């Protein structure tokens, strides 16, 4: 009789578990799952671009600490500054089976190889079990992949523009640029700055030349064709309007290099080194992004009055007030984590906490946000 009762109990448990596996979890069940993960430590491998010199590194560290404290889980942080080397490492890790559990990465075409390989889980799939996942985001601002699905929960946005060291300009006899700044004025100012013994443009051509180059492309084209890329046919460059725009931009870059407006070691210096040249008053101009605001505030609080954000000089159809910005990065949950029930819950909770209204508000200073309620910075 006891054997029959035990068998019946096992059958009831199996039926109950099978029923749970195929339906959406209620809020109560989600809370139960979160409570369970708090009692058994889960290690999450997380890859981000919040490296040591990133302006939001401290905010990221605080968010991770809060997550670990609230869940009892442990984050194995594998963060580095965004660069081609970092991007290459991310691709290599996926190719060699060293997938992270959560990835903070570009939401554009760079993520498509991972999506096509089935390495990432869509937000739609996550919501089959966690219906409230990423519902604090504006749907229109969640990047859509080529397959029509959405994978990345947006983080903070960004803008790119011209940082100016006011002190260097004053010592060079150059005025702070206005909203109608032209390419011709910029070249004249660079020459004055060079003659005064300063570096006109802080830029590492060997590591991160693209912030400046993006504007040079726009200066030789238009907003409408900014994202168009040159094409090859049979190994030969197709000489069309796009190719001509890129060639003209490269010529402008070469003009700046030949004139000696970059650091003497621009072909070997790291981006960090050239940013320091700007921050410490050795260089006048730096084309960079909003993420640098936090870096300057934390690393050079005594010099903040010297830094001004101005417009990148305009040329052709582009007025100086046309800039570059948007939301280009977000959090992905990998298939590796999703297929592990414990890591699944831990990863969902991690992304949910890192992209909550409260947490993202600590990251946002002047950037675009996808939060429905908007960001409310504390400072």
Regions found by a protein language model. Name each.
Residues 30-40, 106-164, 187, 212-218, ...:
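Hinge/lid segment of periplasmic solute-binding proteins
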Residues 36, 124-136, 178-179, 221-248, ...:
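Short, solvent-exposed loop/beta-turn-alpha elements that line the ligand-binding surface or hinge
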Residues 69-80, 173-178, 254-268, 282, ...:
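A local structural motif
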Residues 80-89, 109, 181-187, 265-279:
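Short helix-initiation/N-cap motifs at beta->coil->alpha
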Residues 146-155, 160, 185-237, 254, ...:
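Extracytoplasmic/periplasmic solute-binding protein
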Residues 188-192, 234-267:
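Glycine-centered hinge/linker elements that transmit conformational signals in sensory
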């Amino acid at each position: 009789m006891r054997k029959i009762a035990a068998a019946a109990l096992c059958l009831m448990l199996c039926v109950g578990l099978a029923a749970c596996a195929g339906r959406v979890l209620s809020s109560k069940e989600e809370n139960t799952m979160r409570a369970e993960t708090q009692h058994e430590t889960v290690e999450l491998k997380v890859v981000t671009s919040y490296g040591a010199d990133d302006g939001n590194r401290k905010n990221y560290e605080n968010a991770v600490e809060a997550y670990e404290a609230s869940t009892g889980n442990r984050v194995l942080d594998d963060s580095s500054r965004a660069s081609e080397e970092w991007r290459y490492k991310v691709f290599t890790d996926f190719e060699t089976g060293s997938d992270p559990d959560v990835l903070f990465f570009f939401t554009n075409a760079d993520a498509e190889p991972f999506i096509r390989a089935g390495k990432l889980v869509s937000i739609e799939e996550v919501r089959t079990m966690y219906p409230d996942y990423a519902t604090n985001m504006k749907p229109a601002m969640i990047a859509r992949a080529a397959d029509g699905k959405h994978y990345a929960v947006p983080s903070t946005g960004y803008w790119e523009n011209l940082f100016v060291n006011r002190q260097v300009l004053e010592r060079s006899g150059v005025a702070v640029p206005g909203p109608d700044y032209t390419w011709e004025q910029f070249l004249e100012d660079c020459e004055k700055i060079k003659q005064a013994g300063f570096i006109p443009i802080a830029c590492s051509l060997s590591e991160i030349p693209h912030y400046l180059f993006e504007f040079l492309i726009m200066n030789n084209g238009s907003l409408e064709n900014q994202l168009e890329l040159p094409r090859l046919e049979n190994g030969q460059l197709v000489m069309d309007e796009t190719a001509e725009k890129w060639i003209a931009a490269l010529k402008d870059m070469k003009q700046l290099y030949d004139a000696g407006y970059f650091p003497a070691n621009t072909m070997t210096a790291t981006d960090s080194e050239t940013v320091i040249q700007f921050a410490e008053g050795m260089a006048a101009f730096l084309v960079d992004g909003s993420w640098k605001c936090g870096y300057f505030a934390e690393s050079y609080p005594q010099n903040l009055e010297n830094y001004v954000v101005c417009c990148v000089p305009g040329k052709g159809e582009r007025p100086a007030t046309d800039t570059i910005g948007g939301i280009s990065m977000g959090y992905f949950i990998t298939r590796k984590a999703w297929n592990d029930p414990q890591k699944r819950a831990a990863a969902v909770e991690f992304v949910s906490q890192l992209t909550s209204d409260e947490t993202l508000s600590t990251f946002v200073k002047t950037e675009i946000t996808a939060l429905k309620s908007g960001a409310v910075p504390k400072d």
